[in-house]
A protein has these predicted regions:
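Conserved nucleotide-binding/hydrolysis modules and their immediate coupling elements
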Residues: 1-55
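Structural signature for extended repeat/solenoid scaffolds and their inter-repeat hinge/linker regions
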Residues: 32-178
Length: 178
């Protein structure tokens, strides 16, 4: 239930990962203690065990990728679980394509819906594929007309002028950030 905390109504609180939930022994239906980290972000700091019901259960986390079905893995020194199917998981491929075109990366005018259509039509699988697109490819897409296709192609052409550090960021290399 929402609670009043430092002058604001809090409906959700950060817990970060399954390891923290296990360490704090948090279960579905528990009453928890919440505080604001840095006076901004609500976070769970503990469990009120005296209010724990007999019917509470530990949360169950997915063990396989919901998109491609690969078994999730976890690096020893990290908290998050992830899909290792880098080259075959559609969600990961599309995510990398969205990142590549994003404003902070190549700054191409395109949204997730555009990338979804391009992916579903088998027109793009890698960032390089964007630069092979022709206007006729784009006009095959639902809702695309001459003007929108030309704007997208012009935006792609303009992206060839971004500074190298943004290209490097756009490639999405692990541990390489802005």
């Amino acid at each position: 239930d929402p609670v009043q905390l430092s002058g604001t109504v809090v409906k959700r609180a950060t817990l970060n990962n399954a390891d923290m939930m296990a360490q704090m022994d948090i279960r579905v239906g528990d009453y928890v203690y919440v505080e604001k980290g840095g006076e901004i972000i609500p976070k769970i700091t503990g469990v009120e065990l005296s209010k724990r019901g007999a019917d509470v259960v530990r949360p169950v986390f997915p063990t396989t990728c919901p998109d491609c079905g690969a078994d999730l893995v976890k690096e020893d020194d990290e908290a998050k679980w992830f899909c290792p199917n880098v080259d075959g998981c559609p969600t990961q491929i599309k995510g990398r394509l969205v990142h590549f075109l994003s404003r902070k990366a190549m700054n191409v005018i395109a949204g997730e819906a555009t990338i979804e259509q391009l992916y579903n039509l088998d027109l793009v699988r890698t960032p390089a594929d964007f630069y092979d697109l022709r206007k006729s490819d784009l006009l095959r897409m639902e809702g695309w007309k001459e003007r929108s296709a030309q704007r997208f192609l012009d935006s792609l052409k303009d992206s060839l002028k971004v500074p190298f550090e943004r290209v490097l960021f756009a490639l999405g290399i692990r541990y390489v950030g802005e």
